[in-house]
């Protein structure tokens, strides 16, 4: 896969305020990999909290920061782990929070992963719209891209980040399949996420099902 991400300093950024949810909401469903019945609850959080995930099923209800440094696995889902606290399949929820403009949120889950729901981010987006957002007093922090950044992993996946006058993400992906050709898509406005990206659903090739089951994954993948 190859991703190209571009962003620059937007006029007015320096006066933007952090935002959190106006209220809490919960979503229920099976975990994609564990098959467990799970509940995840998104709550308002104070300024400068960021995204924090609390395992309320564990002793002491420990909290893990949803940051890149805590990503330990990306096989069929994003896993965060630190000091024995582990939570997986967070990617749809995290994407929805960011795209909808939520800066601070405490997320409580009663198991080792978020529920898969319908395999997309739509339900997260709908709930965020339903409860709404509230401005906070602290200014929003921004990363400003001033020069090209490029990262390639051992599998050949590549991310290129470029300065630009507008926000955009372009993704290209090859599935090595005679049934699905290489895919190409562009998101040129983050506000289009709810309509153009959120409905995209997780899928799997038949050829991959047995290896995934043997890896003790997709126990809840009966959508």
Which residues make up each language-model segment?
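C-terminal regulatory domains involved in ligand/effector binding and gene-expression control
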Residues: 5-103, 108-223
